[in-house]
Amino acid sequence: MTTKMPRLLPTLPLLFALLAAAAQSRGPASAEQRQRVVAIAHKLEAAPLDQTLFPEREWAKQWVLENPDVRIRMCMQLLPDLRRPRYKFRLEIVDQMMLSSAAFLIEHPDKAGDHLAENVGGVQGVLKVYTAIVKSNPDARVLALDEMLEKESRGKLVEFARETIKACRF
């Protein structure tokens, strides 16, 4: 079986250029749009597998990608075990990192540029999603996320994130 990914790679710069052009031509985000993103992020934290929320998730992801007002900087080093594509809920977790980070920045505009705070906000959303997923799918456990839950319960999540994001380039 062949993969289509190598053929798609040359088109990625064009896609990013088009997204950047669309973002620049857009005006500032409305307060209603911002609040909608926050509401969607929090709904998904509680019910990440609710299929009725999937269109909302897609809208919010697109909004975050195209909106120049809320610029997120995710450190994927915080989610190491999710790089393997076999993890069934990988997309839900990664999408939530993006949406929870955006929601954090919308709720805390004074933290724009604070990569640590932004990523901790994203990870806290991820841990809520992961907890909800594991509750209905006990076999969905991932060691790295279990360890982060344990760090969060001991008040060590910020310290862990601070050390981990040193390896990320923002």
Please state what every model-predicted region is.
Residues 1-2, 22-25:
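Basic/polar N-terminal segments that are highly enriched at the extreme N-terminus
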Residues 52-164:
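Mature extracellular/secreted ectodomains of secretory-pathway proteins
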Residues 165-170:
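Domain-length accessory/inserted modules outside core catalytic folds
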Residues 20-21, 95:
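A generic alpha-helix preference that emphasizes hydrophobic side chains
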Residues 2-12:
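Bacterial N-terminal signal peptides that target proteins for export
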Residues 10-20:
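Bacterial N-terminal signal peptides
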Residues 24-62:
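Immediate post-signal-peptide N-terminus of mature secreted/exported proteins
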